[in-house]
Amino acid sequence: MFKYTLLFPGQNDINRKKILSPFFSKNKIVQSIFRESSEYIGYDIWKLIQDDPKKKLKNNKYSQLVTLVSSIAIYELWKNKQCTHPNLVIGHSLGEYTALVCSQSLKLSDAIQLIITRYKFMMEAMSKKIGLMTAIIGLNERTIRKLLKKYDYSHEVSIACINTDNQIVLSGERNSVKHINLHCKKAGAKNIINLYIHPPSHCTLMKKASKKLLYVLKHTTFKIPIYPVISSTSLKFQNSEQAIRISLAKQIYSTVRWNSIIKYIKKDIFIFLEVSTKSILTNLNKNIIKKSLSISLNCQANFLKALKIIL
């Protein structure tokens, strides 16, 4: 039996017509999770992904909840189809909430309320500011940190995510991010992509939001995860209720070190399964580790392929 880890994304490229393949959308377990989640959220999230005439899913307020619920629904179906347990679970950014739900550390209802509250606090932190997040392709972390220091942008612009050796996400005040983007381009960046994520996360602008969130987290019930969970920002195991609270609070202004965490665990883990409707983390992993197997459970073919390998 192979060791495997489950990966949970924090963001997905939401396309409402293709959020869930028929393999999932027609499944009773998946439908049940969406019904339960809709009760906690206060509106029909299943209907939203089927018909979104006002294009609400372009707003993080809605898309983050869809990402969470979709991943949990796919996980519940996965759990129903096999009897093995993951050796590890990891969430990228907001995906840590999903990882904690699936490892029975956090109730689904509490996760939904935390994500709604987290978004509210982050929006309040940006009340008089305009933010921006961009992905820099083709420059490494060291080069970008030198540019931030050279042009004195270290306080206005943060490294939000180190996804691979040569894919770095920047986050911060819009004009400052735009200026450092120009310097990155001159330094040899192959591509610079504006990310439609608002408010901007994993940057110093979110420190006030972090303090507010910590207060709420202190009044939220957590349990010790039944599967090992590693934080994608601190790279530490979440082995106590207090550690989880502190990690989730710090997360919104800290760097997601995806590149480091995957390199670290590849010594013991051969198979990486992304529990998602897309393949964002799977594609990142293929750039980080060449010899391990990465599969997204985003369609029937991949789901059945993964089941066959694991069983």
From Swiss-Prot:
Coiled coil: none
EC top class, as a word: transferase
Keyword Ribonucleoprotein attributed: no
E.C. number(s) listed in UniProt: 2.3.1.39
Molecular function via GO: [acyl-carrier-protein] S-malonyltransferase activity
Disulfide bond found in the keyword field: no
Keyword tags: Acyltransferase, Fatty acid biosynthesis, Fatty acid metabolism, Lipid biosynthesis, Lipid metabolism, Transferase
PANTHER family found in the cross-reference section: MALONYL-COA-ACYL CARRIER PROTEIN TRANSACYLASE, MITOCHONDRIAL
Name of this protein: Malonyl CoA-acyl carrier protein transacylase
